[in-house]
Amino acid sequence: MNSFTRIGLRSRFLLVLMIGLILPTLSVWGQNATITGKVVDPKGEPLVGVSVLEQGTTNGTVTDMNGRYSIVVQKDSSPLRFSYMGFDNQEIVPGKRRVIDVTLTENSVVIDDVVVIAYGTKKRRDMIGSVSKIKSDEMSLMQGGRFENSLQGLASGVQVVNDGMPGSTPQIKIRGIGSIASGSDPLWVVDGIVGGGSTMVNSNDIESIEVLKDAAATAIYGSRGANGVIIVTTKKGKKGGLKFDVHYEGGITPITNSDLGLASTKTYFNIMDEARANVGLNPLDPQKDIIEPYYSNWTSPITREEAMNTDMDWVDLVTRMGHFHDINVALNQGGENSTTYASVNYRSDESSLKGLSMNAVSARLNSEFKKGIVTLGTQSFLKFDRKKSTNKWAVVSDKFPWRKVYDPEDPTGYWNPQMADGHPTATLDNDYQLSTGENFSFRTTLYMDVNLKWIKGLSVRADASYGYGLAQSDYWLSGLITNTGNVDGNQGNKSKKTTKSQQYHAFAKYNREWTDHGLDIVTGIEANRSYTDNAVVAGKNLSGEFQEPKIIGTMLGNNSAYIGGESYTFSFFNRIDYKFKQRYLLGASFVREGSSKFVKENRFGDFYSVSGGWIISDEAFMRNAGFISLLKLRGSYGETGNQNIPSEVTKNSYSIKSKQYYNNMQNMFLWNIANKAAKWEKNKSIDLGLDYALFNNKVNGSIAYYRRTTSDMLMRVQFPASAGSPNSGGNADNNSMWANVGS
């Protein structure tokens, strides 16, 4: 009996143990499940490479050549997300289903995407002008870099040149150079306000960027649109509760080409020996002859044999591993009648070239309030940055590999301190040549939109903007690294530039569509005032070794200067777009603009554009071409102007001579002879393009041909000495042809 009891207890124990082992397995089997299926388009064709992801995990797969997939989900309650380029995403909760077939719907955004244009918006398929759009998520791929760099890769016909200096503004060219001497930079429009450039934008605040390239798109901006237009739309608040977004990005910035192939000491002397032989000179004795004959201005008494003991890599001495940090905090809040977006950004850059650095802080506030037919809004942005730089790259470029960094036998501690460029590491370590700059920028805009409901499609808008900028810079050059015989000693200068701008818009928009017709009209006025005040004081033979010349009283002298002035523009603009049966497109714009930079007779210029488009893919004879989603032919002709010249071109201007003549008296001379004939520089452009989208919008792009001719070009013409003035404004012609393919 006792034996039976023991056996029974043992059996029960084994049974409990087996149940304990099996139940977790059953539980896991109940959670993990294999889901299979097929993904097709609306026509039933299989889609290859569709991403299938279990939400909340990293568990995912893609469809095969037949559009089929298989995935083991961890929880059958977790949604499966199906995503594919050109189609809307779809989420499905498996539940108890183990076979899930999915039909993805085409994403119409590619074709019906709304682009921002001058004083309004338009569907991409209805665009006749040449416009490229870049969204914020596309720019986010350019991590660590400036957002301007993404324009070159994402907008066809755009060139971006960046010198790599921390905080520097890249040079941007749209379809080449349109003006030789009067500026070729495009016009920046941020939230409808002209001017400010890319420095007035924090890349984290950008919602989208539109690049306007041809006259059909830019003519309405008059003179300022001659070199293309870049429209930046910043983020606005969205309905919902208070949301915070914190973003940090950091990284290293190594020198892009550290191996410059600089000659070693041995290679240098071999080249010099060959050079002497080529001109018929006798070879030198490495043990007796000093190095001076190799370089006529060099005074070192050492021989080649002594020099061969040194092989210095000067590039390595002045470079480092650069790094950057970018911190952005954004706030988003919105209700039924009001929305707010605010952000603060801090960025620091240490260049891969020693001595170059930048620190910047910026902030933005966008607020909007709606009540009935009226919308009121404000947009404000401010930025402060501090930069430090020294000119050392030019110093390194001509330093010999046999030159020592430090020579204890030399009274100054290093070779030839009298050279014009000085000693690179001594300059670095002691800030003997230093440039510092501080910049503050501020812009605020108040706008009001009114939708006039009693006239369907009619709305009016008025806005006023004020901008302020302050740029201060200091430069210091120690007397230790000036040329031999130079009696200027310590040198320095200090500059202060103040800019102010005011801008006003008032315009009306009418947008209406009937059965077979569509009409979009914009008409309005714009007024601008800009003011500049720039003062520079400079001095030489300064006492002490202060690197930032703060005691400006000791520096005043003949090298001081002041430049200032103000200018005004006023324009009346109009644009009309018409479409018939959603596929025949016509457009025209006209602008009359006046500038205070020209004399009364040439003050006003008239600029216009005409354009047309044909959406061929909507025709009946194209309906059987199923692989073509969009095929649009477009063309335009237009004329824009340029008045980007100094205000004194049409006036006589004088300058003070730095040297004193005529009985030691200060004298003045005529610096610029007034050119009363100066008038608007004109750019005439022709643009022909073919826009396409294929295979359910999976492939899209454009092919374009354009030609731009510039006449009445504004540029400086050098005068002979007998004229008594060095220069005056003149005219020239520039013709160019370009071809472009983008996708």
Predicted segments with their positions:
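A short beta-to-alpha transition loop/helix N-cap that caps and shapes the active-site region
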Residues: 253-257, 385-389, 642-643
